[in-house]
């Protein structure tokens, strides 16, 4: 597919890629913050980032509820989602080319001006609890955090994560957003039909984004250790066996190494 890539680095710390695909009929948006579970204030509230992500498309400066925002966002078929990992929180959206600006404005609105409220907070705590409880029947979901812990990574298992949910308050959500959602911590990729005028509009929107300056958090690298013995999870109710092998590199891979690993995988 014919395309050109332009790197953007703005004075307010925002960085990203603009990918021009001249014949594209849709626009794709990805926004990422280093705001995952490892960046929460305490392990006792580990699921703060996950719950905040679930509240990402709720009430904000323009819409009073998630229902109102969702109805407006998707009225022409646009799609959005969000995800949280140990390190990152990502927001994505896809839309038809003709409404790219409206969807970009709505995405930035939800990211920059959420109005976290108690009603949506209680609802999403329950949704996150149900989601994680469902993973307890997935052998792979149980195995990999145990392997990570065995190699020295400071992560929690799904059982441990569920136990932290009751510790989290609405103020924890607001605090985590304030800490992590800054212009310096924002990275983006936008792909579609990006004319010169569209690029100028996009850059202007990021330059005027209603977020404070802050910190681009360092990628967390734990001190690795060699497990003394294999990790076993005994589940007497299971009729099959799931197993995995993990090789740990004790540093962050550079871009070329990541590309090579993706090809290898």
Regions from the PLM with identified roles:
Residues 1-2, 75, 224-227:
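Short solvent-exposed loop/turn micro-motifs enriched in small/polar/acidic residues
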Residues 9, 59-62, 67-216, 232, ...:
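Charge-rich, well-structured scaffold segments of protease-associated domains
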Residues 17-20, 177, 229-234:
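Short, surface-exposed beta-strand/loop micro-motifs that present aromatic residues
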Residues 22-73, 245, 255-265:
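Active/ligand-binding-proximal structured segments within catalytic/core domains
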Residues 126, 218-228:
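Short proline/glycine- and acidic-rich turn/helix-capping motifs at secondary-structure junctions
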């Amino acid at each position: 597919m014919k395309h050109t890539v332009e790197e953007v680095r703005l004075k307010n710390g925002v960085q990203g890629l603009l990918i021009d695909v001249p014949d594209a009929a849709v626009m794709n948006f990805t926004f990422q913050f280093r705001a995952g579970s490892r960046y929460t204030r305490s392990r006792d509230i580990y699921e703060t980032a996950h719950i905040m992500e679930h509240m990402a498309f709720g009430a904000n400066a323009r819409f009073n509820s998630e229902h109102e925002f969702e109805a407006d966002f998707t009225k022409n078929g646009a799609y959005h989602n969000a995800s949280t990992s140990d390190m990152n929180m990502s927001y994505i959206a896809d839309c038809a080319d003709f409404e790219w600006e409206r969807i970009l404005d709505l995405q930035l609105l939800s990211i920059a001006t959420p109005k976290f409220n108690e009603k949506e907070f209680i609802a999403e705590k329950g949704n996150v609890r149900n989601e994680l409880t469902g993973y307890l029947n997935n052998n792979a979901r149980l195995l990999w955090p145990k392997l990570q812990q065995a190699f020295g990574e400071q992560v929690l298992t799904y059982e441990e994560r569920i136990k932290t949910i009751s510790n989290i308050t609405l103020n924890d959500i607001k605090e985590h957003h304030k800490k992590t959602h800054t212009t310096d911590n924002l990275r983006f990729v936008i792909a579609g039909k990006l004319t010169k005028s569209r690029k100028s509009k996009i850059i202007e929107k990021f330059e005027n984004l209603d977020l404070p300056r802050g910190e681009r958090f360092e990628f967390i690298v734990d001190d690795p250790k060699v497990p003394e013995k294999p990790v076993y999870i005994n589940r007497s109710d299971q009729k099959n066996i799931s197993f995995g092998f993990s090789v740990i590199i004790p540093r962050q891979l550079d871009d070329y190494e990541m590309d090579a690993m993706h090809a290898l995988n």
